[in-house]
Amino acid sequence: MADVTTVADDEAQIRALIQAWADAVRTKDVNAVMRHYASDVVVFDVMPPLFVQGAEPYRCNWQDWFDALEGPADFQFVDLHLAVSGDLAYCFSVNRLRARYRDGTKHDAQTRATVCWRKIDGRWLVVHEHASVPMPVPESIAA
């Protein structure tokens, strides 16, 4: 018999996965972070390079960033929206991240994120992630 779930079930599963991902970021657990990504994920991150294709290269980005931090990260969703339809889902959010780098520099930033999920072999996995920060513009064009 096929696994039949309701949209509410899928939404609850994804919300639990999102929370587990955030907990893994807070504790800098790269293995737990990477459990959420499809092997062929495409990521547009706020840090170079312009994009990353594949979970293994993205793992390196996470590990390098975690290694640069002193202590845990304070990560919070300021606003999170989720929609599910069939085997696809997306969420978007504004996120707040506070951390301290090993050189003593403090990091306190808000980012915008869009994450696309696909149910693959019964598991919800991230297939695309896009994070961005507002870009400063000259005052003459800022409305």
Identify the meaning behind each predicted range.
Residues 2-35, 42-143:
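A beta-strand edge to alpha-helix "cap/lid" segment located at domain peripheries
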